[in-house]
Amino acid sequence: MEKFQGYLEFDGARQQSFLYPLFFREYIYVLAYDHGLNRLNRNRSIFLENTDYDKKYSSLIVKRLILRMYEQNRLIIPTKDLNQNSFLGHTSLFYYQMISVLFAVIVEIPFSLRLGSSFQGKQLKKSYNLQSIHSIFPFLEDKLAHFNYVLDVLIPYPIHLEILVQILRYWVKDASSLHFFRFCLYEYCNCKNFYIKKKSILNPRFFLFLYNSHVCEYESIFFFLRKRSSHLRSPSYEVLFERIFFYGKIQHFFKVFINNFPAILGLLKDPFIHYVRYHGRCILATKDTPLLMNKWKYFFVNLWQCYFSVWFQSQKVNINQLSKDNLEFLGYLSSLRLNPLVVRSQMLENSFLIDNVRIKLDSKIPISSIIGSLAKDKFCNVLGHPISKATWTDSSDSDILNRFVRICRNISHYYSGSSKKKNLYRIKYILRLCCVKTLARKHKSTVRAFLKRLGSGLLEEFLTGEDQVLSLIFPRSYYASKRLYRVRIWYLDILYLNDLVNNE
């Protein structure tokens, strides 16, 4: 980002908030290309993912593209002519993808500068474990035990592209960039619809930025109302929702807002509320009554429908009572479990029995969904009975065994924090027997004859990896075997989930 700031200060674009001239600078394409090289493999730059590009950066393509952008009529190609029209050996879809990569990098600059200025003079705690998927579970174990209800909300996607453009209007003040972005976004989607049957090149950085800007606008309104809920009992609310792109819908929204929201906002005051967003969903945990949770539910529905023009059904907001219902969270089924404890106390000649109840977060493995995923990838049938993996029989024995061991180790690694390990045993059994059936099918033998010939040493490969990991946690090895499946272990080095089948 320091490189970007240096170039922006040189061009004077930062002071004037003009981003459009950067689309015609060759060094921005170079920086976007270099920035893509430093990303993870799953978010590589479009310059590397395009097979026609020969995995090399070409300044000639960039120069021709810039010349073509000066004549915008040459960028507009009818959908029926997309196959015939190519530019320097590439279709127009490739160039719209190049522009989308560049736009994502350029528009991130004001966001990064604003974020950096907000943290100036503050010391941020840097911890590798905070990036882990499992880092949230210790927080939930401490907080959810004091809550009664959880609101599970599915964040809707905007169905119209103009909504995304309007959201960016609040952040990007350059009208030329917004017009150019609108034009390229519509043309890019038209090209994508034309190539829908072909394997198109994904640009996760661009669409991730659009989604984050959409969610950022929603959360800014939600957090503002959450903090100011105690001051929203006055009859005038116009100042609270003043936005630069809100002209056409302002009267209709205030009519709905004034009629419905005063009674809602009057009951939204709750200092003990927690908000968590993950995988396109968000949960709202609080210690309140069902009436207040219903108020929050219809608040979300009205917010999405009236402010973002997104049809949002109330069925997408679920109210879960933690003591009775299970909450799907990061691949676990979480609920609160009551553990009764009886304590005997004796004072002089009198003894007392004190009944205590301890609330504990119970995280279970969703066995039905995991078996469904394994059945989809042909590890078992829909009933959970292991079958042979026919597509892997062409590989060597060591390769087949290593694949199954890796998958089993990843599942064990991720679901080791479950409170009950019975379902984990079943998943491991499916994978082990599937591995044996695959090897037996390759050697054209039965499972019984294959195991009799190789012995039990074949299945020991599934246990060695776990013993090596757990030895770091339990220094005394004789305790590791006894507490292997009775202790909940949250591994804080899981940053993202790989595809279990294609994980190499």
From Swiss-Prot:
- Keywords annotated in UniProt: Chloroplast, mRNA processing, Plastid, RNA-binding, tRNA processing
Subcellular location per UniProt equals: Plastid, Chloroplast
Q: Which GO terms describe its molecular function?
A: RNA binding
* Cellular component, GO annotation: chloroplast
Question: Key word tRNA processing present in the record?
Answer: yes
Q: Which family does it belong to?
A: Belongs to the intron maturase 2 family. MatK subfamily.
PANTHER family attached to this UniProt entry: MATURASE K (PTHR34811:SF1)
Q: What does this protein do?
A: Usually encoded in the trnK tRNA gene intron. Probably assists in splicing its own and other chloroplast group II introns.
Q: Under what name is this protein listed?
A: Maturase K
